[in-house]
């Protein structure tokens, strides 16, 4: 696995719930690809998850991936919570169904296709990759709003 890819992901939501968007900046051997999309009625957490899923789905073969997000929800979910959710049949410690389990399961499936290193950055402090992903996520929101 010598293919190394950088993914910068972000989600945005105007209202929570409300119209939302996701954005991904993919960098491979210096070449950049931008991905974005949105949904009419969603949450910020769903859009953060969707960005990571869509970024990983865009990779056609197994890769080493450095995925950078500003979402503590995604970071904690993937690195801390998911192992126990899976053991409990996608239930929380309080025996409640995991919120956004559909997307967590999709993310788990995509992560298992690759060797992913997860990185967290604070949002909106000028990190170039994160700022680009944020702009793309907002483009996703704008396109959804324009279709109304």
UniProtKB/Swiss-Prot annotation:
Entry cofactors: Mg(2+)
GO biological process assignments: DNA replication, removal of RNA primer
Annotated CDD domains: RNase_HI_prokaryote_like
Main location: cytoplasm
EC number(s) given by UniProt: 3.1.26.4
GO CC annotations on file: cytoplasm
Record's subcellular location: Cytoplasm
Catalytic activity: Endonucleolytic cleavage to 5'-phosphomonoester
Pfam families named in the record: RNase_H
GO terms assigned for molecular function: magnesium ion binding; nucleic acid binding; RNA-DNA hybrid ribonuclease activity
Superkingdom in the source lineage: Bacteria
Keyword Transferase belongs to the record: no
Binding site for Mg(2+) 2: 10, 134
Binding locations of Mg(2+) 1: 10, 48, 70
Keywords annotated in UniProt: Cytoplasm, Endonuclease, Hydrolase, Magnesium, Metal-binding, Nuclease
Record note on cofactor: Binds 1 Mg(2+) ion per subunit. May bind a second metal ion at a regulatory site, or after substrate binding.
TM segment ranges: none
Quaternary assembly: Monomer.
Role noted for this protein: Endonuclease that specifically degrades the RNA of RNA-DNA hybrids.
Family stated for the protein in its record: Belongs to the RNase H family.
Protein name: Ribonuclease H
Record lineage: Bacteria, Pseudomonadati, Pseudomonadota, Gammaproteobacteria, Pseudomonadales
């Amino acid at each position: 696995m010598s293919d190394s890819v950088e993914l910068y992901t972000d989600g945005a939501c105007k209202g929570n719930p409300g119209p939302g968007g996701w954005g991904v900046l993919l960098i491979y051997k210096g070449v950049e690809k931008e991905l974005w999309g949105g949904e009419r009625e969603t949450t910020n957490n769903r859009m953060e998850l969707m960005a990571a899923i869509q970024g990983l789905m865009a990779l056609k073969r197994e890769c080493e991936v450095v995925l950078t997000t500003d979402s503590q929800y995604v970071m904690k979910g993937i690195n801390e919570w998911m192992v126990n959710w899976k053991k409990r049949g996608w239930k929380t410690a309080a025996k409640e169904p995991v919120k956004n389990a559909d997307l967590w399961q999709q993310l788990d499936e995509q992560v298992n296709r690759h060797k992913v290193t997860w990185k967290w950055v604070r949002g909106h402090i000028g990190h170039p990759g994160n700022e680009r992903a944020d702009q793309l996520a907002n483009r996703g929101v704008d396109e959804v709003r324009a279709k109304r």
